[in-house]
Amino acid sequence: MIPLSLRIMPRLSLAIPTCDYHGKGDALLDDLLRTVQIQSFKDFEIVISDHSEDDKIETKVQEFSELFDVKYHRNSNKRGNSPANLNKAISLCTGEIIKIMFQDDFFYDDEAFEKIYYNLAGDVSKSWLLCGTNHTQDDGHNFFWDIFPRFNDNLLDGVNTISSPSVVAFKKDVLVRFDEELIYLMDIDFYYNMRKTHGEPIYYDDVLVTNRIHQDSISSNITNREELLQNESIYCKQKYD
C-alpha cells in the first residue's frame, strides 16, 4: 500500500452517501458501482460515508476495493440526516473535481467521468456543473423523462427544475455545503446557494446519470410533505433575505 503522504491525489472524487435503504442498500450500491467500473476515465476515487448500522454496505465496498480506489467511512454522526451524511462524504474527498452521486442512482453514460472532468476542469470561469439526467422505474430496463437542469424564479418554493444532487459536480475549492436543518429542500437550497456564491454553472446538456424512481427513495418516504415543504420554503427565504 502506498503511504498517504506519497499518494497522488485523483482528478475526480465520487462522493456517495449511503444507508441501508430498508435492506436494499447494498444491492443499489452494487448497481451504481458496476456503472462506475465501466467508466472510460480511470483517474478517480470513490468516497463513501455510510449511515448503515449493519455491515452490508461495507461488505459490498470490499468486493470492489481491488477494482478502484475506495474510501469507506462508517458514519454514526447524525444518523438518518441525509445532508449531514453527504457533507461528510464531501469532506473526505481529495480530487480536483467532486461528483455527487446518491446510491440509488447510477451512471447512464460510460464516458460520464471524462465529460464532467474535462468540461469543468477546463473552464477556469466556472466552479460547478449540472448534467442531464433521465429516469427509470424498472432498474434500467427502460428509461424516460430526460431533464436538462435549469433554474427558475420559484426554486425556493420547491419548484425543482434541476433534479437531484446526482446531477452536480463542483471544484474542490467550493465551500458551499448542504444545510443539515433541511430534508425536502436540501437540494434546492444547495443549488440556490451555489448560484448565489459561485454564479452560473456549466449546463451540460447531455444525459450522464439515471435517477431511479422507487417506493423506498428518501423523497417517497417523507411524511407531512406539504407542511414540511411550506416550513422549509419559509426557512430558505428567510435565510437568503
State where each predicted segment sits.
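Active-site acidic Asp-centered loop
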Residues: 51, 101-103
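Conserved nucleotide-sugar donor-binding catalytic segment
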Residues: 14-16, 131, 149-228, 232
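Short, well-formed alpha-helical segments that are part of the catalytic scaffolds
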Residues: 21-38
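Glycine-rich, basic loop-to-helix element that forms the pyrophosphate-binding segment
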Residues: 76-93
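Conserved donor NDP-sugar-binding/catalytic core segment of glycosyltransferases
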Residues: 106, 111-143
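Short alpha-helix within the catalytic core of nucleotide-sugar-dependent glycosyltransferases
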Residues: 29, 33-34, 58, 87, ...
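Acidic donor-binding segment of Leloir-type glycosyltransferases
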Residues: 33-77
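Short aromatic/hydrophobic "clamp" motif used to bind/position activated sugar donors
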Residues: 98
